[in-house]
């Protein structure tokens, strides 16, 4: 049996994507819509306080295309806290005019390829990646993925050393985009339908296409990668929520 890679796990993660029922939303009076928006912004302010205390992080983006209208990416120390956030949001007036489009549950994950004599949880750089402050980049790209396990293309039957070698080569491509694209990898084996979630942040949306396309030619992706639905969007700052929901 091949050796399983050890992982380092950080904050739990929820990608919550929703569509807005604009037709029903328009039936509310201006006052009712304003009250609903204020209620929603109060929840966002709670999230901001948690982030300021470094007990979690969040990102909010509008999604381009028909798959969804808005995405919340939420990071918290426990799965219970993610559930509480989701439930509180579902109880708002605004949620009555939102339709669940997609969700993904995972945990921030790093593969442990550090020297055996080093405690990764004492490494500030590792801690910053396990418990990240999500960036306020202009754009987001999220997609789930698996490692293929079919016939001769079975990732999980490869020896550990070969997997390390392949992942090192794969990572070299990603490092070429340092400063252009920030990546958050979350593990979801046993949590959701795929094995990993990949979230990319960039100020230049074209960098997503360049990075993903270049990685398609790397053996890890070309031979072993299987991908789910891609979601791409634009940042939605709190101060623009009112204009976004204005009808």
Swiss-Prot record:
GO-annotated molecular function: heme binding; metal ion binding; oxidoreductase activity, acting on the CH-CH group of donors, oxygen as acceptor; peroxidase activity
Pfam name, any one: Chlor_dismutase
Ligand binding (Fe-coproporphyrin III): 129, 143-147, 170, 183, 221
Catalytic activity, EC: 1.3.98.5
Alphabetically ordered keywords of this record: Heme, Heme biosynthesis, Iron, Metal-binding, Oxidoreductase
Classification via SUPFAM superfamilies: Dimeric alpha+beta barrel
Cofactor(s) needed by this chain: Fe-coproporphyrin III
Keyword Oxidoreductase appears in the UniProt entry: yes
Enzyme class: oxidoreductase
Cofactor details (free text): Fe-coproporphyrin III acts both as a substrate and a redox cofactor.
Active site residues according to the UniProt entry: 143
A single BP term in Gene Ontology: heme B biosynthetic process
Known catalytic reactions: Fe-coproporphyrin III + 2 H2O2 + 2 H(+) = heme b + 2 CO2 + 4 H2O; Fe-coproporphyrin III + H2O2 + H(+) = harderoheme III + CO2 + 2 H2O; harderoheme III + H2O2 + H(+) = heme b + CO2 + 2 H2O
Biological pathway: Porphyrin-containing compound metabolism; protoheme biosynthesis
Task performed by this protein: Involved in coproporphyrin-dependent heme b biosynthesis. Catalyzes the decarboxylation of Fe-coproporphyrin III (coproheme) to heme b (protoheme IX), the last step of the pathway. The reaction occurs in a stepwise manner with a three-propionate intermediate.
Family note: Belongs to the ChdC family. Type 1 subfamily.
PANTHER family assigned to the protein according to its UniProt record, in alphabetical order: COPROHEME DECARBOXYLASE, HEME-DEPENDENT PEROXIDASE YWFI-RELATED
Full protein name: Coproheme decarboxylase
Species this protein is from: Bacillus cytotoxicus (strain DSM 22905 / CIP 110041 / 391-98 / NVH 391-98)
